[in-house]
Amino acid sequence: MRAATLYRYSIPMEAGVILRHQRLKSRDGLLVKLQQGEQTGWGEIAPLPEFSQETLPEAQAAAIAELQRWVNGEELDLGPLPSVAFGLSCALAELEKLLPLSADYHKAPLCTGDPDELFAVLQALPGEKVAKVKVGLYEAVRDGMIVNVLLEALPDLKLRLDANRSWTRAKADGFAKYVNPELRSRIAFLEEPCKTRAESREFARDTGIAIAWDESVREADFQVEAEPGVAAIVIKPTLVGSIARCQQLVQQAHQAGLEAVISSSIESSLGLTQLARLADWLTPATVPGLDTLSLMQAQCIRQWPDSTLPVVTVDQLDVLWHS
């Protein structure tokens, strides 16, 4: 006997969370629960505004159609919408006990640029000292100076930087000019510095700063391949698709000698804990990029270890559909 329920959550965000062009006041998404006999599986479907190709209403309609088919005994067709494919594949993997329970709760902390604050966070971290800095929100020169200060102050630090394609080539060069060439090798990678792949490749070649593909991974013409100056691909499952698609990308990256980094799209704590399990399974040697829970004012159903945020329980969620 199969049963399914679709819930909706809305979690207030901390003030000042800005996506590309808009402030995110709340994180809204769907949670799916599949039940078959004694087994239960959960998944999260949460398109990210400005980044996902689908809207939440589109994801909701597609999810309900799929759940209806599944309850009627058909196989789940994960469909073309990445957030729906990822959420349903997680629920199915939990139901069938295919998603391992062990998780990698290490995370590359998101850093605002204060070396003292970052030093305190990193001192408490076991293993590799990796942090992430968002660049491209302010002046490129300011970003370069902050990165240089962090690398100088913390000699065992490696930085991941994310520019979200926000720079012209001239601005990217302005950033690089303020990062001491001797420190650049400790930039693990800079995600998509320029507006085009060609400009980003040229930037890596001319500055010696390694880059990673992020937005490109979701584009139809993208091929995972080894190329000079490219160190990694960033996999955001909510934006990429099913667990199987994520596995495929990880395998292709490793075959090409690239690092694959599982990364958050600001999912709730339920989705984040699943990403931690996915990272431990598929990319055990790489610290995942999951430090987004602090952007929220609450957790949802499942707790992230050590988080003191209040937890929204299943009884507090709106039921959108139930079989």
UniProtKB/Swiss-Prot annotation:
Catalytic activity reads: (1R,6R)-6-hydroxy-2-succinyl-cyclohexa-2,4-diene-1-carboxylate = 2-succinylbenzoate + H2O
Tell me the protein's name: o-succinylbenzoate synthase
Q: Which UniProt keywords apply?
A: Lyase, Magnesium, Menaquinone biosynthesis, Metal-binding
List the SUPFAM superfamilies.
Enolase C-terminal domain-like, Enolase N-terminal domain-like
One GO MF term: magnesium ion binding
UniProt gene name: menC
Q: Which family does it belong to?
A: Belongs to the mandelate racemase/muconate lactonizing enzyme family. MenC type 1 subfamily.
| Protein's organism | Yersinia enterocolitica serotype O:8 / biotype 1B (strain NCTC 13174 / 8081)
A GO biological process held by the record: menaquinone biosynthetic process
Lineage, top ranks: Bacteria, Pseudomonadati, Pseudomonadota, Gammaproteobacteria, Enterobacterales
